[in-house]
Amino acid sequence: MKVFVTGGTGLVGRHVIAALLARGDRVTALARSDTAAAGVAGMGAVPVRGDMTDVPAIEAGVRGANAVVHAAAVVLSRRGWEHYHRTNVAATETVARAAATHGARLVHISSVAVYGRKTTYDGGERSVDESFGTDRPIFPGDHYARSKREAEQAVWRMAHEEEPRLSAVALRPCVIYGEGDRQFSIRVARVLRRGVGMVIGDGSNPLSVVYAGNVAAAALAALDRPDVQGAFNIANDGAVTQREFMERFAGGLGVQLRVLAVPRFLAWPAASAADLVLRAARPGSPMTLFKAAVQFLGHSNPFVSSRAERELEWRPVVPPAEAVERTGRWFRDAA
């Protein structure tokens, strides 16, 4: 199989490329710079120069491919909605249209953010599966969630309403961690290297996290089942509690960790105050960054992935305990 990957130097993209090459597939990947192209080539894939706004480059990458894994996305940026729309929504439309035109299967890396993080966490929801719907409120200023929802809607328009019809699967991971992560894991590593970690409450709640290698395994499962279409949660690859995540990550880092438990009733007002300070100091910063972090840390994982296990036959390849320690070791060695 020949597969074109976007976001090939990002967290999920790197794991997808590695998994594809390990089983003998041919891989090309979009590379927006000489450095990115060298990184793609270093992994054993063939770089296609261009970024997510470069329509001819995307067309060239998709042409001749049997399938596309679209993993490129802006997760956190201070550049405003237009930047999110251009990179996450318009670019997804371009990739999906090219895939439909050239008859390539599309695996779109979406997010559980499409459900509306305010509803799933604030509402105390449990067992959020794909029937939950994507019409619930989104935090004001949560450009990432809005853009991922609109991007996925664009995929379904092309799959169900436009010609030629697109063969597509959307994978909805929760917070992704793993080796090479420049978003979440790198921040965890920076904090834990100090030898002190913080948990909200007693830390016994299962976190909404998934290992990048297990997301890649889901992408390959979707590629191998071209008759299956639709959206799938990839948000539960085994339970790992808030406290266990911190302790195992620190173990991988080689750090003796002291864990501080912060009561929930103190964490929320502190996060609200921190958001106010952040917005004053850095105009354009996400409106609810610290409150979103408290929600994520302090609530149990509400998402279930049984549909992916059943229809895609997705099986996580690395258990969480090993994956967290492996991630910590990577950041230890990369320091």
Functional labels for PLM-detected ranges:
Residues 150-151, 182-187, 200-223, 229-230:
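Substrate-positioning beta->alpha
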Residues 35-41, 45-93, 98-100, 116:
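NAD(P)H-binding glycine-rich loop region in Rossmannoid oxidoreductase-like domains
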Residues 222-287, 305, 321, 325-328, ...:
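Mid/C-terminal beta-alpha module of Rossmann-like enzyme folds, strongest
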Residues 115-116, 166-187:
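Flexible, glycine-rich beta-alpha linker
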Residues 178, 200-205, 232-240, 250-253, ...:
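Glycine-rich Rossmann NAD(P)(H)-binding loop
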Residues 93-144:
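Conserved Rossmann-fold NAD(P)-dependent oxidoreductase catalytic core, especially the SDR/UDP-sugar
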Residues 3-23:
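N-terminal Rossmann NAD(P)H-binding glycine-rich loop of SDR-like oxidoreductase domains
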Residues 139-169:
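Active-site Tyr-X1-5-Lys
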